[in-house]
Amino acid sequence: MSKVCIVTGKRPATGNNVSHAQNKTRRRFLPNLHTHRFWVESENKYIKLKVSSKGMRIIDKKGIDTVLSDLRAQGHKI
């Protein structure tokens, strides 16, 4: 299961854990993803999307219908 936001495209970034002694070990910074059900009034059904919290704010701002049409235009099967 990929850790990618379907709306924003956010994916894991890499970096270092740095201890007090400045020892560095590699780590991954994971996006804040949630599987969320959105009610789509035009289709009269729920759509389940894996989105980050930023993606949820974009859906709140633009509307689920606009975001879904953009995703379908990009080739996502939803």
Swiss-Prot record:
Record-level GO cellular component terms: cytosolic large ribosomal subunit
Keywords for the protein's UniProt record, in alphabetical order: Ribonucleoprotein, Ribosomal protein
InterPro entries: Ribosomal_bL28 (IPR026569), Ribosomal_bL28/bL31-like_sf (IPR034704), Ribosomal_bL28_bact-type (IPR001383), Ribosomal_bL28_sf (IPR037147)
Pfam family membership, one: Ribosomal_L28
SUPFAM superfamilies: L28p-like (SSF143800)
Coiled coil (residue ranges): none
One record GO biological process: translation
Domain of life: Bacteria
GO molecular function term, any single one: structural constituent of ribosome
The keyword Repeat is annotated on this UniProt entry: no
Family: Belongs to the bacterial ribosomal protein bL28 family.
Protein name: Large ribosomal subunit protein bL28
Organism annotation: Francisella philomiragia subsp. philomiragia (strain ATCC 25017 / CCUG 19701 / FSC 153 / O#319-036)
UniProt lineage: Bacteria, Pseudomonadati, Pseudomonadota, Gammaproteobacteria, Thiotrichales
